[in-house]
């Protein structure tokens, strides 16, 4: 009787330790987020050690629920850009179409160049949209194919400071490609593609 009792006590102690270890063990080395759309989910790994300010700001928006019922609203394809411009391919999203008043109140994120971060605009890179350096906030884009023009020192901006890359799609690139092929009017998705939410994993 006592033998069974001690065996059971030891078993439950082991299970408790296992559960505690599982809870304390991080699932990922870097934070991951899931972009939820009707076309499927896009999993993105973020790089806080390389682009700490960009990642911190983006995660603060994710945690606050800012991206709930937002959208992908802009698309660049080779065929929808003027023949005189450099060609790039991407999808851009955020709250600009769904809550532009809120977007205008958000503080700018200090610009982290790809020269500083070491990140490049390759297929699946997520990066902050901006006008002038330090003006980026809630809006972001995902590269479809390699886009070196968006890196530091290249031609996407007159200031040649590039855009602030801060993560990469690690699962669901087929969803990005599917969204990229949806109908557009000029550079605008028609209709916009709903982002149901962006959540931490």
Label every PLM stretch briefly.
Residues 21-201:
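Cyclophilin-like peptidyl-prolyl cis-trans isomerases
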Residues 1-29:
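Bacterial Sec-dependent N-terminal signal peptides
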